């Protein structure tokens, strides 16, 4: 039985985050030939259980996010050195990989995430550190995983390495029968950051009169607070605090008429993959990542004018919207199920 250590997440049971959900489902769909050990943040879990989904849990008393993520990942890597395989999710701890390769015979597999160093939210120093960490991850890993074909292309063009493309599952969100008689609101769900085109979406809806339910961490940043102040008085826009309850999310997603996805960076986004399982039309920001995820079959916008044209022409576009919804579901079922994703990971071990 192969021993696989997973490094780089807050841990399981998943409280939030794409990587945590990935780990929860890798362990849930694990075959009998795999024994996982997952490193967890002692700061995240008040109750520290020893096992979950058949995986052993090891706690490190540091935060998994922010500046502490670097020593958190490094300590996790050092404790993983006797494993058969180390699966690293994200690159922040990869500064330690040259040492790990010297002291361990483990196979190193790294999911480099969504080109974090390119994100506008980071300052110059953090961007440089993340870029260097990415370089180390690619250079010192036996296998590199990319969650989107565009990132696979980036790795090939910049490092000459063939990354393996494995996305995320989304079928865990289906908690019942999806409501086909949709309500009259559009739904959007994301971290409230400029790169997710939050203001573009809000501004367009403020002028259109269409109903929008927008879920996000509005009070976690000055940008989010600014958005609340600017748009909270529009009666057609409902700005909802983060929802982590999967049943509540199911109801919101199930009843929406369409989903608006503003992400412009980060590879394959879990929230997009998840909504595709609901057979809802997707209005996505026009970038290579989103086009790959939706196989060029969503409706795309690059600015307010594009989005408003879709919103203002629902009747004319009804057949296109219906076909889009059917395509989203078909793509989700063929590409984005956790059983398939878990099998793809295990094939690399």
Task: Write out the residue ranges for each language-model feature.
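Short hydrophobic beta-strand element within catalytic cores of glycosyltransferases
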Residues: 258, 280-284
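Conserved donor-binding/catalytic core segment of Leloir-type glycosyltransferases
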Residues: 5-7, 179-215
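N-terminal strand-loop element at the rim of the active site
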Residues: 9-16, 28-66, 150-152, 156-158, ...
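Donor nucleotide-sugar binding/catalytic pocket of nucleotide-sugar-dependent glycosyltransferases
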Residues: 110, 134-175
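An aromatic- and histidine-rich active-site surface loop
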Residues: 68-81, 85-113, 117, 267
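Membrane-proximal helix-turn-helix segments that form the acceptor-binding/catalytic region
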Residues: 78-81, 126-144
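Nucleotide-activated donor-binding/catalytic signature segment of Leloir-type glycosyltransferases, i.e.
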Residues: 216, 225-246
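Aromatic "clamp/platform" in nucleotide-sugar-dependent glycosyltransferases that forms part
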Residues: 263-264
